[in-house]
Amino acid sequence: MGRAEAAAMIPGLALLWVAGLGDTAPNLPRLRLSFQELQARHGVRTFRLERTCCYEALLVDEERGRLFVGAENHVASLSLDNISKRAKKLAWPAPVEWREECNWAGKDIGTECMNFVKLLHTYNHTHLLACGTGAFHPTCALWRWATAGGTHASTGPEKLEDGKGKTPYDPRHRAASVLVGEELYSGVTADLMGRDFTIFRSLGQNPSLRTEPHDSRWLNEPKFVKVFWIPESENPDDDKIYFFFRESAVEAAPAMGRMSVSRVGQICRNDLGGQRSLVNKWTTFLKARLVCSVPGVEGDTHFDQLQDVFLLSSRDRQTPLLYAVFSTSSGVFQGSAVCVYSMNDVRRAFLGPFAHKEGPTHQWVSYQGRVPYPRPGMCPSKTFGTFSSTKDFPDDVIQFARNHPLMYNPVLPMGGRPLFLQVGAGYTFTQIAADRVAAADGHYDVLFIGTDVGTVLKVISVPKGSRPNSEGLLLEELQVFEDSAAITSMQISSKRQQLYIASRSAVAQIALHRCTALGRACAECCLARDPYCAWDGSACTRFQPTAKRRFRRQDIRNGDPSTLCSGDSSHSVLLEKKVLGVESGSAFLECEPRSLQAHVQWTFQGAGEAAHTQVLAEERVERTARGLLLRGLRRQDSGVYLCVAVEQGFSQPLRRLVLHVLSAAQAERLARAEEAAAPAPPGPKLWYRDFLQLVEPGGGGGANSLRMCRPQPGHHSVAADSRRKGRNRRMHVSELRAERGPRSAAHW
């Protein structure tokens, strides 16, 4: 049995094998920016309403330049260019009587008995379709947001109708839907108790259809995630709607207990239901397992909790790429993954064998009997047959479709494994959006992944060896919400190069790129491997594909600056920093690379020595994330220390520090000279000029960074010790502020 067959019928893969991943360290981003840094330097914008939560529904309208937001008791229209300005909001609360009924049913009137807007769709050129929970009375409405001439306008709901089967009752439940023409396809819970799970079609001219109720073979406690309309051919009669969800696996062995799996389901858009059986039910519904796992010798490690799916369109509308984020359901370890699927692989699974179980005590197997014609799951059209309607399907086709909705073979990810993994990072992936970017050496897919701690990860998919295998590289980690609220929805505008992120507490907007934060040197810009950015000869700026590509330096595939930046002379001269220490004391040599993925190496050149030797960790030497700590200083520690960042095999000097180790007597002379000096007016102190005379008679004007730590002699008074400790602390703090700088500033 191959891996595909083993993954399909689960008993052998119900266990989560973590032998190969349990000790895996989380991937570090090259650049990490806090909310404060984004706010101060990179233009993060936020929107929130007073006493309102749960911004779950986002809709981008590129034509009108608006972002529509659905939240608790409100629908808002924001500018795509700046969500903080020109916001228009309309209240849509649940009626008082509905809230009272909700409260009488045992729900909390303050947190549950509200109208939580879950669904927003563009209905036509002037109206939106919005649906909300309505205090456990699902309701939908058409909202006018533009005039016939295109002018932006906003009024209240013009047409109200029952939202049952369109949006959930309970605000804790997710809604997944797509509007195709005037038809709404939804995956929801259709009852107050949250037990009637259904895939439902409403609105439009075709009859309303749903899945078979209370049949675990069709749906078994599903959690709906996303819905897409994807054409199958040039004939619109072949169009299908694809549902992505997770559910309890009916095919799991009883001994394994309850097990969650991810699914992709399909229905035909022109399905009209059956004539004698499956009346007002789907006759073309099929589902297959969606696998995202890491192969291993002892078994596969499964990421079985589907969280979100993004459809990245291509030139051929029939073959988009599907990017999906998953998490684990195991308590053994915490992990998330991104898997990529092709529509050809999805269709291949639905054309494969059906899953079959003869009886309650039998195992699930591949169906070996005769499959009726037309094949269940095929749409009635002239492309694949002569049937013009599902009502014309023979009874044996309808009966087979009712009893065999599950496919035997799963859908495996491209490359056979996840594109990107994050294990033990302290967060879970919740949302994903993608953008296809033209770079100097090809086109690249850039992923934006939302987490449950309010961060967005920027990941690029690059070829790994021979195509089509790819790997994901983590470029950035951005804290877009100050309160670390979980990200619940994301929308992307490739046209405006903006990302819109929603959480329970607010909506945020960030640009897709921050080229100036990548560095001030050609090598830094090239090592970043950001397809949005390139070195223009003087700065890291936005890359625009033009005919003059030779003037822009960019290498996304390899990230190798050795050739591209060989002629770059900017910032090639390191400023020399002087650091002072006292025998038997300590000295801290600060050097923190901009990239968290860089490895720092230290070399030392003693006085009178021609060669640099590598500084190794020992009892007196401690490496830290921010630099090198030297303890028990000796006179022979004086010399030149060079800090070099190594990344992707490329070495880049960061800092050159000259350490002078002084005797206790020299340090004492300095202290007494300072105490005898008259108080200086406010401003920079120049006492170090006298101090440098002890080290460099006749010089010392070039010292722009000083730090001294010395032991306290035992014969000094306590008061003198206190004064010196305070003086040293002031000296350390002032130098730290001068030298550290922000993470987005260069160190030389």
From Swiss-Prot:
One Pfam annotation reads: Sema
Q: Where does the UniProt annotation place the signal sequence?
A: 1-25
Positions of region (Disordered): 708-748
Q: Which residues cross the membrane?
A: none
Q: What range(s) does the Ig-like C2-type domain occupy?
A: 561-659
Domain Sema, by residue range, is 30-512
Keyword Signal in record: yes
Cite the SMART domains for this sequence: IG, PSI, Sema
Q: Which cysteines are joined by disulfide bonds?
A: 102-113, 131-140, 268-379, 292-339, 515-533, 643-709
Is-annotated flag, keyword Signal?
A: yes
Glycosylated residues are 82, 124
Please state which protein family the record places this protein in: Belongs to the semaphorin family.
What role is this protein assigned? Inhibits axonal extension by providing local signals to specify territories inaccessible for growing axons.
PANTHER family linked: SEMAPHORIN, SEMAPHORIN-3B
Listed name of the protein? Semaphorin-3B
